[in-house]
């Protein structure tokens, strides 16, 4: 392990103590507040003489399995493209998600399912917690390779709280419709991470630039993450929608949007690529934007054609972002976006929110019939017009951007505290800083890691 004895000693204690404290505090809060809901508690369920076939587990758990695989396998492997950071990409994804799902159960529980002095949990709580963990992992992608595990846990601690508040404001106070989380998950997670990355800007990061690229096998592993995410994204968007036509429509719209974004990505990648060749970075990421861009509108009457058009647009915009905007983001705005979350989640999330504004504004009783109540209950009840709902959708986007920006700024200041362990500029994107790597002794003998140096946050 590289570094001075003092840093090594601090690293040895910092992560264990923080993990023990967070897990202990979470366990105490669970003991005091968390209880099974009526669909999970043995006595309450059987007291009502329900048939086991009616339990929500049988309707929701298949979607939960897909979402869970996306969070732990999809996100984890999507970030293993860095040639010397695979352990950290998968391992820290595992760590962050495991903590975030516990902490978000509490935060979301206090906001959404707190009654009788307790938080009541079931399979929907598990899905919501995974959604929140997904937002945290999106933010992680923006600072991948430049932060230590203790910093990341503190980032999650703050972000989960702000995620829960933002979600509560949008869904419960503003009545925004966002079935697949274009705003609450993707836009929030992306811009929280981007602002965080800006605050943590490292002017001397060039010292580790040689590790920031991929190699052949790391790109292949990343494609595993891409395919997992691509396959399961219809379940992600439909996981918590109303059973029946709404859930069916959500999966269908996402399915077609993903297909179109993939073709758009291949087309643009070849068009802007050197000698007309495809860029694996584009394929790994931009092909997924079809799932992001229809997140808000997937439950609405978007139409299959609308889903195709939205997906194709998202794929092309994201590919152009990776090719042209990412370098500008770093050189002009000093945002070092390791995974390009602005192109995969940020821009497509904003486009998805704007698409939701458009589709909500076109909602009519004739188009939705009796299904209007499940998609736009306030319009069905006569409390809002379609135009008013569209304006609330637009305001929800601005609220999300505000929470994400302020939260990312606060998170950056928190993570810059001098006692928190982070890799020096010359050791970013390097597994050996935090992991025992097979063959590391031979590697050090040939090319030793640099001695300890100070971080250079701007």
From Swiss-Prot:
Give the region (Disordered) as residue ranges: 439-458
Which family does the similarity line name? Belongs to the ammonium transporter (TC 2.A.49) family. Rh subfamily.
Give the UniProt subcellular location, in the record's own words.
Answer: Cell membrane; Basolateral cell membrane
Q: Which GO terms describe its biological process?
A: ammonium homeostasis; ammonium transmembrane transport; transepithelial ammonium transport
Please state the gene responsible for encoding this protein: RHBG
User: Which parts of the chain does the record assign to the membrane side Extracellular?
Assistant: 35-61, 108-124, 171-178, 241-251, 304, 368-393
What are the TM regions of this chain, as residue ranges? 14-34, 62-82, 87-107, 125-145, 150-170, 179-201, 220-240, 252-272, 283-303, 305-325, 347-367, 394-414
Q: Where is this region: Interaction with ANK3?
A: 416-424
Which residue stretches are annotated as topological domain Cytoplasmic? 1-13, 83-86, 146-149, 202-219, 273-282, 326-346, 415-458
| Function in brief | Ammonium transporter involved in the maintenance of acid-base homeostasis. Transports ammonium and its related derivative methylammonium across the basolateral plasma membrane of epithelial cells likely contributing to renal transepithelial ammonia transport and ammonia metabolism. May transport either NH4(+) or NH3 ammonia species predominantly mediating an electrogenic NH4(+) transport. May act as a CO2 channel providing for renal acid secretion.
GO terms for cellular component: basolateral plasma membrane; plasma membrane; spectrin-associated cytoskeleton
- Per the record, the major location class is membrane
Is the keyword Endoplasmic reticulum in the record?
Answer: no
Instruction: Indicate what this protein is called per its UniProt record.
Output: Ammonium transporter Rh type B
Motif Basolateral sorting signal, residue numbers: 429-432
Topology with respect to the bilayer = Multi-pass membrane protein
In the UniProt record, which residues carry a glycan?
Answer: 49
Pfam family for this entry, one: Ammonium_transp
């Amino acid at each position: 392990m590289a570094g001075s004895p003092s840093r090594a000693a601090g690293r040895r204690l910092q992560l264990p103590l923080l993990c023990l404290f967070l897990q202990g505090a979470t366990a105490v809060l669970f003991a005091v507040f968390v209880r099974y809901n009526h669909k999970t508690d043995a006595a309450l369920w059987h007291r009502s003489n329900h048939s086991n076939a009616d339990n929500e587990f049988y309707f929701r758990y298949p979607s939960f399995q897909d979402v869970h695989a996306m969070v732990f396998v999809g996100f984890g492997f999507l970030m293993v493209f860095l040639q010397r950071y695979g352990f950290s990409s998968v391992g820290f994804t595992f760590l962050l998600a495991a903590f975030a799902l516990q902490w978000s159960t509490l935060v979301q529980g206090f906001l959404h399912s707190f009654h009788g002095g307790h938080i009541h949990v079931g399979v929907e709580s598990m899905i919501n917690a995974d959604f929140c963990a997904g937002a945290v992992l999106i933010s992680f992608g923006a600072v991948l390779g430049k932060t230590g595990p203790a910093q990341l846990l503190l980032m999650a601690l703050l972000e989960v709280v702000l995620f829960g508040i933002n979600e509560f404001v949008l869904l419960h106070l503003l009545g925004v419709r966002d079935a697949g989380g274009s705003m609450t998950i993707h836009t929030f997670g992306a811009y929280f991470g981007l602002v965080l990355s800006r605050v943590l800007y490292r002017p001397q990061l060039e010292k580790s630039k040689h590790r920031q690229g991929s190699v052949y096998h790391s790109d292949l592993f990343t494609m595993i993450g891409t395919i997992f995410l691509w396959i399961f994204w219809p379940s992600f968007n439909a996981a918590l929608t109303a059973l029946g036509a709404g859930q069916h429509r959500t999966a269908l719209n996402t399915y077609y949007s993903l297909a179109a974004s993939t073709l758009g990505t291949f087309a643009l990648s070849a068009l802007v690529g050197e000698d007309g060749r495809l860029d694996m970075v584009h394929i790994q990421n931009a092909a997924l934007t079809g799932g992001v861009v229809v997140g808000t509108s997937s439950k609405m009457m978007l139409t299959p054609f609308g889903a195709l058009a939205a997906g194709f647009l998202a794929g092309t915009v994201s590919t152009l972002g990776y090719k042209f905007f990412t370098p500008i983001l770093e050189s002009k705005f000093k945002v070092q976006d390791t995974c390009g979350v602005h192109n995969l989640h940020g821009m497509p999330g904003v486009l998805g929110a704007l698409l939701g504004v458009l589709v909500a504004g076109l909602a009519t009783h004739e188009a939705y019939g009796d299904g209007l109540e499940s998609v736009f209950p306030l319009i069905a009840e006569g409390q809002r017009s379609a135009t008013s709902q569209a304006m609330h959708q637009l305001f929800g986007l601005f609220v999300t951007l505000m929470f994400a920006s302020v939260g990312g700024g606060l998170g950056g200041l928190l993570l810059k505290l001098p006692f928190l362990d982070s890799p020096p500029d010359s050791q970013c994107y390097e597994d050996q800083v935090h992991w025992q790597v097979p063959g590391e002794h031979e590697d050090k003998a040939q090319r030793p890691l640099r001695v300890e140096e100070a971080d250079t946050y701007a």
